[in-house]
Regions:
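C-terminal auxiliary extensions adjacent to catalytic cores
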Residues: 2-23, 27-34, 38-46, 72, ...
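Glycine-rich, flexible loop motifs
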Residues: 2-42, 46-49, 76-135, 226, ...
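FAD-binding core of FAD-dependent oxidoreductases
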Residues: 53-67, 71-75, 82-105, 135-157, ...
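A broadly conserved amphipathic alpha-helix scaffold signal in soluble, globular proteins
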Residues: 120-127, 147-154, 216
Length: 514
C-alpha cells in the first residue's frame, strides 16, 4: 500500500504508521503547482542583481559575501559538504525515514523554492530502502538541524554515506545500487534541505509516540501493582477527580477503574481493612500519571504543528512574489516540547520505582513474601532487580534536566541564541528505554505479587496481562538469571502485548479527545 504524503492530511496517527512500518510513500501530486511557483521565484531572483540570502550570497556570518553566478551551483554543493560535520552513532533507521518524510512535508508546502524533482528525490530514496547515515551529534537546533540534514542531503547528490540492504556504502554507491541518479542542486536548494527542524522534530515525535505507549503501559502495570499490595480503589472514585478537573487525571482514574473491575483480591479487603490510607505511590497514581499525561498532551500539540510547518529560511511568499528572511528554523518550540516529555518520563519512572520498592519490602507490602520470593534467604528474589530500577530512575532524573535553557552562541555570534532541541530530543530515546526496563521490573513484581495472593484472583483484564506475561516469562520460584526476564518483558511492552491483552492499546489521537 502506498501512503500519500501531504501537509494538509497528515496527523500523529498517520505519522506513527509511517514510523512503525516501512511503507511506500508518494508526495501528493496536487502540491506540485505551488512548489513550481516557489521555485520560479527563486530562479528569477538568482538572475537578478539584488543579494538574496542563500541564493547568491554566502551563509551565516558570510551572508555579506556575494557569489558570482558561475559559482552558484558549486555554492550549494559546498554548503552541503561543509555542513556534513556530524559525529556520533547514526540515527535509528526508522527515525531517519521519519525525518525524511517530515522534510518532504515541509518542502511540499511551497515556501522553500526547491524543484519538484528535488522533493521526489527524497521520495525515491525512502522507497528504495536507502537510509542515509545521520550522525546524531552536531546540531544545536538553530539555524535548524544543519549538520544532520546535511548528511541527508549529501546522499541525494551522491555524497556522504548510507545503509542499503544492511550494508554501509558511499552515497554514490547506494544510489547506484538502487538505480537512482544523483541530483544537482539549484539556487537555494542546498539551504532549503539543510535549514529546518526535521531532525529534532523526528526525534521528539518518535519519543512522544513511545511515551504515549509508556503511559498506557504504566496504567496497566500500576493497576496490577495496586492489586498486588491489596491497595484501595477508593482513590479512583470519579467524584474525586472531577472535583479537581484535570483531564489526564480523570482519564487515568477511569482506565484504572476499568482494569481493576471484578478483582476478587480487591473485594477481599474492602471491609475491615485496618489500613486507612495507602502510600502516595498507590493513592496518588491518577494525579501523577495524569499530570504526566497532560504535559505530554501539551508537547503533542506543539509537535503536531511542527510536523506540518515550514522551518526554512529565507522563505518564498508565493502570493506576494518575494523572498523574505525570518527565523522559523529556530527549534525553540521543539526544545520546550522535548523538555516536557523528559519531565513526564522521569516522573512516570519515579513513581513506578516506588511501587517496586513497596512490593519487595515485607514491612510495607501487606503480607507479600520478602522480595517476592519463596524461601527468602536462600533466594534473593527481586532484591537486585529493585536496585536496578533505582539506578535507571536516577539516570532518568538526571537526563530530565532542561536542555532548552542551555543556549550558546555559534557561527561568530551571528547565530547567538540556539535551542539545543536536537540533544533535548535525542536523549529521550535513552529515557524511554530506561523507563521500559523499569516497567519490566514492576510488571514482574506485580504479577508475582498477585500470584502470591492465590486463591484470590485479580480482575479479568489484569489476569489477561499476567497470562500474556507468563507465555514468555515463567514465575520466579527460585533464583535464576533475572536479566533475561527483564529484557524479555521490556520487549513485550515494546510490542504492546500487554496493552493488547488488557484492551488498552489506544491510538495517540486519544490525546486530543481528553
Amino acid at each position: 500500500m502506498t501512503e500519500i504524503i501531504s501537509p494538509h492530511s497528515i496527523n500523529l496517527d498517520f505519522l506513527e504508521k509511517i514510523f512503525r512500518n516501512k511503507l511506500e510513500i508518494v508526495v501528493d501530486p496536487e502540491l506540485e503547482t505551488n512548489v513550481a511557483k516557489s521555485y520560479e521565484i527563486v530562479q528569477k531572483s538568482a538572475e537578478g542583481d539584488l543579494p538574496v540570502y542563500g541564493v547568491n550570497t554566502g551563509f551565516g556570518k558570510l551572508a555579506n559575501k556575494i557569489i558570482p553566478s558561475e559559482d552558484r551551483e558549486q555554492l550549494q554543493k559546498n554548503l552541503v559538504l561543509s555542513h556534513c560535520a556530524g559525529i556520533g552513532e547514526p540515527l535509528p533507521e526508522d527515525v531517519t525515514r521519519l525525518m525524511m518524510v517530515l522534510k518532504i512535508v515541509s518542502l511540499s508546502l511551497g515556501a522553500s523554492g526547491v524543484k519538484w524533482s528535488t522533493i521526489k528525490q527524497i521520495e525515491r530514496i525512502i522507497n528504495s530502502g536507502i537510509v542515509p547515515e545521520i550522525p546524531h551529534q552536531g546540531s544545536v537546533g538553530a539555524s535548524g538541524d544543519l549538520a544532520p540534514l546535511a548528511h541527508m542531503a549529501a546522499v541525494m547528490i551522491g555524497e556522504g554515506f548510507a545503509f542499503y540492504n544492511g550494508e554501509k556504502l558511499s552515497g554514490f554507491e547506494a544510489l547506484k545500487k538502487a538505480g537512482i541518479e544523483p541530483i544537482t542542486l539549484g539556487p537555494k536548494e542546498g539551504l532549503a534541505l539543510l535549514n529546518g527542524t526535521q531532525f529534532s522534530t523526528a526525534c521528539a515525535l518518535a519519543s512522544l509516540l513511545d511515551a504515549w505507549r509508556s503511559v498506557l503501559n504504566s496504567i496497566v502495570i500500576s493497576s496490577l501493582s495496586t492489586d498486588a499490595i491489596m491497595g484501595s480503589t477508593s482513590p479512583l472514585l470519579p467524584q474525586i477527580h472531577e472535583l479537581r478537573g484535570h483531564k489526564g487525571q480523570i482519564f487515568v482514574a477511569s482506565k484504572m477503574r476499568e482494569l481493576m473491575d471484578g478483582s476478587v483480591i480487591r473485594e477481599s479487603h474492602r471491609e475491615n481493612d485496618q489500613r486507612v490510607q495507602d502510600p502516595y505511590c498507590i493513592r496518588c497514581q491518577p494525579q501523577v500519571l495524569g499530570a504526566s499525561l497532560d504535559i505530554l498532551k501539551n508537547a503533542s500539540v506543539t509537535i503536531d504543528i511542527e510536523t506540518k510547518a515550514v522551518t526554512d529560511n529565507p522563505l518564498v511568499l508565493v502570493d506576494e512574489n518575494k523572498i523574505v528572511s525570518g527565523g522559523n528554523f529556530h527549534a525553540e518550540p521543539i526544545g520546550f516540547a522535548a523538555d516536557q516529555i523528559a519531565l513526564a518520563l522521569a516522573e512516570i519512572g519515579s513513581i513506578s520505582q516506588r511501587r517496586i520498592a513497596l512490593m519487595v519490602d515485607p514491612t510495607l507490602s501487606y503480607d507479600l513474601p520478602p522480595f517476592l520470593t519463596d524461601d527468602a534467604g536462600l533466594n534473593s528474589g527481586f532484591m537486585i532487580a529493585e536496585v536496578t530500577s533505582a539506578a535507571l530512575m536516577s539516570e532518568n532524573k538526571h537526563l530530565a534536566n532542561p536542555c532548552v535553557t542551555d543556549s550558546t552562541p555559534t557561527s561568530a555570534n551571528q547565530e547567538d541564541h540556539v535551542s539545543m532541541s536536537a540533544h533535548g530530543a535525542y536523549r529521550l530515546f535513552k529515557m524511554n528505554k530506561n523507563l521500559n526496563s523499569i516497567f519490566g521490573i514492576e510488571l514482574l513484581c506485580a504479577a508475582q505479587g498477585v500470584e502470591s495472593r492465590q486463591p484470590l484472583k485479580t480482575s479479568p483484564l489484569l489476569q489477561n496481562a499476567v497470562d500474556e506475561l507468563r507465555k514468555h516469562v515463567p514465575r520466579l520460584n527460585e533464583d535464576r538469571f533475572v536479566a533475561n526476564d527483564i529484557n524479555n518483558v521490556s520487549n513485550l511492552l515494546d510490542k504492546k502485548n500487554i496493552l493488547k491483552s488488557s484492551k488498552l492499546d489506544l491510538p495517540i489521537s486519544t490525546f486530543f479527545n481528553l
